[in-house]
Swiss-Prot record:
GO molecular function: 4 iron, 4 sulfur cluster binding; cyclic pyranopterin monophosphate synthase activity; GTP 3',8'-cyclase activity; GTP binding; metal ion binding; S-adenosyl-L-methionine binding
HAMAP family with a match to the protein in the record: MoaA_B (MF_01225_B)
Sites where the protein binds [4Fe-4S] cluster 2: 265, 268, 282
UniProt-annotated binding residues for GTP: 30, 79, 109, 169, 270-272
Gene that this sequence comes from: moaA
Binding locations of S-adenosyl-L-methionine: 43, 83, 133, 203
Domain Radical SAM core residue range list: 21-233
Record bears the keyword Cell inner membrane: no
Protein name: GTP 3',8-cyclase
Length: 327
């Protein structure tokens, strides 16, 4: 059944590419496979988080159809996210299906806890770009952030993936008086295992809003601190990149994702598909359109509609939780 919005959009011509009125071409899609997670990071979700019924999840076939339609409109890259995507029961089936599509790149964002169980599947389907969350190398601090005691498991799996040739970026949410004293240890760890590390500003999203003001550290403050120890050389990045990156005098590569202090909305090329089928033009917008039960024709009109829903300037804080939208 057509939604009212779709009926309105039927009067508009459909473009063969996803380019909005600001000239931003949508070429990347974040795809959530589950809202469940085996960590409880305090900036992401409460300890007693309530998750969706799995009957509301998109099926493997639905993922394939939606992503295939977007590829025909110019989509080039997909990143599988969660929650924790490796907890999806039919993860292998979904990865194999997406791996058969004509994408330039498929990546995965994970916390690494069960990564070792899936490395063969990932390698076989050319999912070689891994973003792994790692907020601390200290077991006590890690436990305080995540409410879990599994740091050694994650480090072991990271090192296994590195030895097997996966391209790994570590994502560290830096928080004042929590883990900000560890940035040099993290840089050295990443360099030792030939991983890039990216320092993220804590964002005003959902559950993090209650902590954000007290713990926020800007990317510029971190950069100045790091420059006291290392010489840094800028690395040129694509216009729509989320991070600004540097090579360091210690031989490593670091990046900064300054979503709060230096938002990159004006060049953003990403949409997000939640596990329940809600397609969003922006991480920081509550609004989205659930396309799960739409026909292919209906979805085509939604894609055009969504181009007009992507803001050019960064919206204020949003209420939905990060794990629910594939952050």
């Amino acid at each position: 059944m057509f939604s009212f919005l779709c009926l309105v959009e039927l009067a508009l011509p459909m473009s063969k590419t996803l380019v909005d009125s600001y000239g931003r071409r949508i070429r990347k899609l974040r795809v959530s496979l589950t809202d469940q997670c085996n960590l409880r990071c305090h900036y992401c979700m409460p300890v007693d988080a309530i998750f969706l019924e799995q009957s509301s999840y998109l099926s493997c076939q639905e993922y394939g159809e939606i992503i295939g339609e977007l590829i025909a409109l110019g989509l080039e890259e997909v990143r599988l996210t969660g929650g924790e995507p490796l907890l999806r029961r039919n993860f292998t089936e979904i990865v194999r299906a997406i791996g058969q599509l004509k994408l330039k790149k498929i990546g995965l964002t994970t916390n690494g806890i069960v990564l070792d169980r899936h490395l063969d599947t990932l390698g076989e389907n050319n999912v070689l770009d891994l973003n792994v969350s790692l907020d601390s190398l200290n077991a006590k601090t890690f436990s305080e952030i995540t409410h879990r005691n599994c740091l050694n498991t994650i480090l072991r799996n990271l090192e296994l993936a590195s030895r097997q040739g996966f391209k790994i970026k570590l994502n560290t949410v830096v928080m004042r008086e929590i883990n900000d004293r560890e940035i040099f240890d993290l840089i050295e760890y990443a360099k030792r295992w030939e991983m890039e590390i990216r320092f993220l500003e804590i964002m005003r999203i959902g559950y993090a809003c209650r902590h954000q003001e007290k713990t926020f550290i800007s990317a510029q403050e971190l950069l100045a601190k790091i420059q006291q120890k290392y010489s840094l050389k800028p690395i040129q990045s694509a216009l729509d990149a989320t991070a600004f990156r540097y090579s360091t005098s210690c031989g490593g590569i670091i990046g900064f994702i300054a979503s709060e202090s230096q938002p990159f909305c004006g060049h953003c090329s990403r949409w997000r598909l939640s596990v329940d089928g809600t397609l969003r033009a922006c991480l920081l917008k509550n609004e989205g359109i659930n396309i799960r039960n739409f026909s292919s024709l209906e979805r085509q009109h939604v894609y055009q509609q969504l181009l007009g829903m992507k803001p050019y300037l960064r919206p204020p804080e949003v209420s939905h939780a990060m794990h629910q939208i594939g952050g």
